[in-house]
């Protein structure tokens, strides 16, 4: 049984981590911090956890966190990097659900997040936690940068094409049209997130530039093993009036080799042994409700024209897009079965 700390337990990803870990047979949450709710019983804030935990929120105490085997940071950007060095020096592993350890390019990090990186030496040795593509590195990692929710759908949606020995798509012409529920913006109060602003509404945001764009580009370059081939990639996120769920529609142009390839078979073979990636039959329609609450991503392919491919990827942004994937990474780091604590089936209806 490993000891777990969660920094930032009152946000949506923090409480989702707790919900998942309370069912984990080999992990016990010992520390759950909150800047504003210290001393308050967790079940008073989250009634779904009544009868499942007697934990209270506490102030952030680095010495208490050092007693844990692993600490998750479900905090705003910039928090994990302030504490990572002290924790790993004490032998504690770190999994950050914010962006502190996602981008290896410091210039891009500082541009998009508006802060200097506090521990570039730790960043250099950290591992990007896209589980299905970085398993062996994750097993050896001390610090994990958990991927963003949108980048998770994009990478898993494109990986079979980019990992192929042949160039199957035109990498400079990729268009990503992505939609997310409002929980992706976090739990903090803001005018744009209140009910009357979002109900009966559907809007694009970050059209001129979104923080996940440089993460997507850097990650795809690593998957493809090529630099500067995704300059023309377009990424536009949208906000839909639902709480959780994400659907990314990815448009690509096929090369001559791509036109001749059985792409359905390519995807099915690539993900044949993956428990948390479901390749649906061709021309299917993955629905966000089918993965609600589950650590699963569903993919479907359409080929409307001989030289065009459309990839649909659906996930729960709080689970496979955040906390579930973080626990998946924790399982690898400690030698557990990858699906420990993550066998839950999506909630439907």
From Swiss-Prot:
Single GO MF descriptor: NADP+ binding
Protein name: N-acetyl-gamma-glutamyl-phosphate reductase
Matches recorded under SUPFAM superfamilies: Glyceraldehyde-3-phosphate dehydrogenase-like, C-terminal domain, NAD(P)-binding Rossmann-fold domains
Similarity comment text for this entry: Belongs to the NAGSA dehydrogenase family. Type 1 subfamily.
Keyword field: Amino-acid biosynthesis, Arginine biosynthesis, Cytoplasm, NADP, Oxidoreductase
Catalytic residues, chain numbering: 149
Originating species: Acinetobacter baumannii (strain ACICU)
One Pfam match: Semialdhyde_dhC_1
Record bears the keyword Amino-acid biosynthesis: yes
Subcellular location: Cytoplasm
Disulfide bridge map: none
Coiled coil: none
Protein purpose: Catalyzes the NADPH-dependent reduction of N-acetyl-5-glutamyl phosphate to yield N-acetyl-L-glutamate 5-semialdehyde.
Keyword Oxidoreductase applies: yes
InterPro entries cross-referenced by the UniProt entry: AGPR_AS, AGPR_type-1, NAD(P)-bd_dom_sf, NAGSA_dehydrogenase, Semialdehyde_DH_NAD-bd
One BP annotation, GO: L-arginine biosynthetic process
Gene name linked to the record: argC
Entries under SMART domains matching the protein: Semialdhyde_dh
Catalytic activity: N-acetyl-L-glutamate 5-semialdehyde + phosphate + NADP(+) = N-acetyl-L-glutamyl 5-phosphate + NADPH + H(+)
Pathway(s) annotated for this protein in UniProt: Amino-acid biosynthesis; L-arginine biosynthesis; N(2)-acetyl-L-ornithine from L-glutamate: step 3/4
EC number: 1.2.1.38
GO cellular component term of the entry, any: cytoplasm
């Amino acid at each position: 049984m490993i000891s777990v700390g969660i920094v930032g337990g009152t946000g949506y990803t923090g409480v989702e981590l707790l919900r998942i870990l309370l069912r984990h047979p080999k992990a016990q949450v010992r520390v759950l911090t909150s800047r504003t709710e210290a001393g308050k019983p967790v079940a008073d804030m989250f009634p779904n956890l009544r009868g499942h935990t007697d934990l209270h929120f506490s102030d952030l105490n680095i010495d208490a966190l050092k007693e844990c085997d692993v600490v998750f940071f479900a905090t705003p950007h910039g928090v994990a990097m302030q504490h990572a060095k002290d924790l790993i020096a004490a032998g504690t592993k770190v999994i950050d659900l914010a962006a502190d350890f996602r981008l290896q390019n410091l210039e891009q990090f500082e541009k998009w997040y508006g802060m200097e990186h506090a521990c570039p030496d730790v960043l250099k040795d950290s591992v990007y936690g896209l589980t299905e593509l970085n398993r062996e590195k994750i097993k050896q990692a001390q610090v994990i940068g958990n991927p963003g929710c949108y980048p998770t759908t994009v990478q898993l949606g494109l990986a079979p094409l980019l990992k192929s020995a042949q160039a199957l798509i035109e990498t400079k012409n990729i268009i990503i049209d992505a939609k997310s529920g409002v929980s992706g913006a976090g739990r903090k109060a803001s005018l744009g997130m209140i009910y009357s602003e979002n109900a009966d509404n559907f809007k694009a945001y970050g059209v001129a530039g979104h923080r996940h764009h440089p993460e997507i580009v850097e990650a795809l370059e690593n998957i493809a093993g090529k630099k500067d081939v995704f300059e023309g990639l377009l990424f536009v996120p949208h906000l839909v009036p639902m709480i959780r769920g994400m659907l990314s529609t990815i448009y690509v142009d096929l090369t001559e080799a791509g036109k001749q390839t059985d792409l359905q078979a390519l995807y099915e073979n690539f993900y044949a042994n993956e428990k948390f990636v479901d390749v649906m039959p061709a021309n299917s329609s993955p629905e966000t409700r089918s993965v609600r609450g589950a650590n699963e991503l569903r993919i479907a392919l359409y080929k409307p024209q001989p030289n065009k491919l459309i990839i649909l990827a659906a996930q729960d942004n709080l689970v496979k897009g955040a906390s579930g994937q973080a626990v998946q990474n924790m399982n690898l780091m400690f030698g557990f079965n990858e699906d420990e604590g993550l066998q839950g089936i999506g909630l439907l209806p």
